[in-house]
Swiss-Prot record:
Subunit structure: Tetramer of two alpha and two beta subunits.
Family, as annotated: Belongs to the class-II aminoacyl-tRNA synthetase family. Phe-tRNA synthetase alpha subunit type 1 subfamily.
Pfam families: Phe_tRNA-synt_N, tRNA-synt_2d
Gene of this entry: pheS
UniProt-recorded name of the protein: Phenylalanine--tRNA ligase alpha subunit
Provenance organism: Xylella fastidiosa (strain M12)
SS bond list: none
EC number(s) reported in the record: 6.1.1.20
Molecular function GO terms recorded: ATP binding; magnesium ion binding; phenylalanine-tRNA ligase activity; tRNA binding
Cofactor annotation comment: Binds 2 magnesium ions per tetramer.
A GO cellular component annotation in the UniProt record: cytoplasm
Major location category of this protein: cytoplasm
GO biological process: phenylalanyl-tRNA aminoacylation
Keyword Metal-binding applies: yes
Chain positions recorded as Mg(2+) binding sites: 254
């Protein structure tokens, strides 16, 4: 080893460092020069093999070279980092004189809008909004509502059961059972929320929203029921149309009825549309919640919120409400 070799190595190392174009290349040079097996490090390891009289001078020379190269590496790294930052600032610069971008405005889902509209109308009629659990037991969902264990009417409801016998409620009527058990007549209430049935097509969903109403008082009659629902339908659709009540069967009411409206279609023709079910509360239901059916009578009704949303907004396929397509939902914002 001679000093000229060290000087030549130093000159080449400094030239390579100055020519480095990126941080990765610079790190490669640092390892090649000053790393564990770098050329400068290997020179320092060879000092022990030199004659004693040469070690001090060459050792001092190598240490100065190492410090010089280290300083050059640090300076070049700072220069490359500064250049990279400047480029990034240019690439990501924002012209503050340009007009700003408006934030996306959200809006209520059409089902939520419909649900709120219905509950608001019934609130004006004096009905209290009540909520209840979506996971029910057989008593509140079926038996208390005059669905005995082997009653054929249970086949009307395609039910999701849990292993312990509980179930996802098939209607919000269970909320009425709980409310009647805790309150004494007279009372007016509506129960709103999600219900679940194993059914899915253009007009049915495994999960949908339902509102059921209940009125109990002395001398409540079917005429009161007809007047209440006729007033609600006219308030919701904001139009007058013919309403008819057809006899129908529901285990928890007697007599029961389906409610149809004379709906004017886009071609100006009129057809009857079924919109909800109703009836006078069955005496067995009152008995199951400890209310004297000889003293009190009442009526109940139920409707699908999505059905009303489809009619109000002209939607043909119920499934569109649950697909979360922003293009569809933006129409109602």
């Amino acid at each position: 080893m001679v000093i000229n070799d060290i000087e030549s190595l130093t000159a080449q190392a400094l030239a390579d460092v100055a020519a480095a174009q990126n941080l990765d290349h610079l790190e490669f040079l640092r390892v090649a020069l000053l790393g564990k097996n770098g050329s400068i490090t290997l020179q320092l390891k060879q000092l022990g093999k030199l004659p004693v009289e040469q070690r001090k001078a060459i050792g001092e020379k190598l240490n100065r070279v190492r410090d010089l190269i280290s300083a050059a590496l640090m300076d070049r790294k700072a220069a490359l980092e500064s250049a990279a930052l400047s480029k990034r600032l240019i690439d990501e610069r924002v012209d503050v004189t340009l007009p700003g971008r408006r934030g996306e405005r959200g809006g209520l889902h059409p089902v939520t809008r419909t649900l709120e509209r219905i509950t608001e109308i019934f609130a004006r009629l004096g009905y209290e909004l009540v909520e209840g659990p979506e996971i029910e037991d057989d008593w509140h969902n079926f038996e208390a509502l005059n669905f005995p264990l082997h009653h054929p009417a249970r086949a009307m409801h395609d039910t999701f059961y849990f292993g312990d016998g509980r179930l996802l409620r098939t209607h919000t009527s269970g909320v009425q059972v709980r409310y009647m058990s805790d309150h004494r007549p007279p009372l007016r209430m509506i129960a709103a929320g999600k219900v679940y049935r194993s059914d899915s097509d253009q007009t049915h969903s495994p999960m949908f929203h339902q509102i059921e109403g209940l009125l109990l008082d002395k001398h409540a009659t079917f005429v009161d029921l007809k007047g209440t629902l006729s007033e609600f339908l006219r308030a919701f659709f904001e139009r007058d149309f013919e309403v008819r009540f057809r006899p129908s069967y529901f285990p928890f009411v007697e007599p029961g009825a389906e409610v149809d409206i004379a709906w004017q279609q886009s071609d100006s023709s009129v057809r009857w549309l079924e919109v909800l079910g109703c009836g006078m509360v069955h005496p067995n239901v009152l008995k199951n919640v400890g209310i004297d059916s000889e003293c009190y009578t009442g009526f109940a009704f139920g409707l699908g919120v999505e059905r009303f949303a489809m009619l109000r907004y002209g939607v043909d396929d119920l499934r569109a409400f649950f697909e979360n397509d922003v293009r569809f939902l933006r129409q109602f914002s």
